[in-house]
Amino acid sequence: MVEPMNWISEVVRPRIKTLFKRETPENLWVKCPDTGQMVFHKEVEQNHWVIPGSEHHLKMSATARLKMMFDEGTWIDVPLPEVPADPLKFRDEKRYVDRLKEARAKTGMPDAFKIGFGRVGSLPMTIAAQEFGFMAGSLGMAGGEAFVRGAETALEKRTPYVLFAASGGARMQEGILSLMQMPRTTVAVRRLRAARLPYIVVLTNPTTGGVTASYAMLGDVHLAEPGALICFAGPRVIEQTIREKLPDGFQRAEYLREHGMVDQVVHRHQLKETISRLCGLLMDVRRTPEPGTAPEPTTPEPLPNAA
């Protein structure tokens, strides 16, 4: 009698459970990191990935950011240059080319930047958004080329350039080729400044490493989303190095605002209105040359190549 009972309990019953099991989507609910509150995924998505009640700002895809910003959620994608996929033939636990394939399949993007041209509050604007889901939004040759192409688009169309930064820093798989994007993007920002075009940076969670050390902190105005981690080295690394406990909220948007590194902390729902107003004011000011000065050239020298 033992064998039939084992067969029933080990084979028949699991099959019955599987047969009548009710399918529940894995992404039906979203859990708030602050309060543990469970919210419908669709409700959070409709709220621009802000948890209702706690107002916790979750990570947001690059495409969702452009849709949130541009009037009627429509824009023209700026074509981005192609770069060598794996010039160093890098391999750690996986080959770099395999990591790229996985990231592209996961995000549907060729790399960690998406750039669009459209209107925000009826004002023409060029917007670049980093995709943290693509290898932590790390900066490589493709990212550097994308940022520069966005700046060139803003120069060509005479629009403000807005960046939504979200990155873990330089992409280690590209070595020095990644690091050289830091000065290249800095030159692109200088070209915008020479042409008297606004460059607005929105620091989102997280913005760290080489991105913080370059174009993310070179804006005319720095906005930040609530609670965003903004730093070069993260708090855990610093605590392990100095063997001391850091202050509460250290390197968060509000802390940086209090210490003058961020101009304003803005709720995600107010970003479009705030950026539209800022860019409108800056464009009005910069259209008029200062008394006694000649207009700045709008086509400065071309940037150096990525490689």
From Swiss-Prot:
Record field: compositional bias (Pro residues): 292-307
Domain CoA carboxyltransferase N-terminal: 28-297
Example of a GO MF term: ATP binding
InterPro entries in the cross-refs: AcCoA_carboxyl_beta, Acetyl_CoA_COase_Trfase_b_su, ClpP/crotonase-like_dom_sf, COA_CT_N
Cited SUPFAM superfamilies: ClpP/crotonase (SSF52096)
Annotated pathway: Lipid metabolism; malonyl-CoA biosynthesis; malonyl-CoA from acetyl-CoA: step 1/1
Disulphide bridges, residue numbers: none
Region called Disordered, residue ranges: 286-307
Catalytic reaction list: N(6)-carboxybiotinyl-L-lysyl-[protein] + acetyl-CoA = N(6)-biotinyl-L-lysyl-[protein] + malonyl-CoA
Biological process annotations from GO: fatty acid biosynthetic process; malonyl-CoA biosynthetic process
Subcellular location: Cytoplasm
Any Pfam family the entry gives: Carboxyl_trans
Record's keyword annotation contains Mitochondrion: no
HAMAP family: AcetylCoA_CT_beta
Similarity comment text for this entry: Belongs to the AccD/PCCB family.
Function (record text): Component of the acetyl coenzyme A carboxylase (ACC) complex. Biotin carboxylase (BC) catalyzes the carboxylation of biotin on its carrier protein (BCCP) and then the CO(2) group is transferred by the transcarboxylase to acetyl-CoA to form malonyl-CoA.
NCBIfam families for this protein: accD
Assembly with partners or alone: Acetyl-CoA carboxylase is a heterohexamer composed of biotin carboxyl carrier protein (AccB), biotin carboxylase (AccC) and two subunits each of ACCase subunit alpha (AccA) and ACCase subunit beta (AccD).
Protein name as catalogued: Acetyl-coenzyme A carboxylase carboxyl transferase subunit beta
Provenance organism: Methylorubrum extorquens (strain ATCC 14718 / DSM 1338 / JCM 2805 / NCIMB 9133 / AM1) (Methylobacterium extorquens)
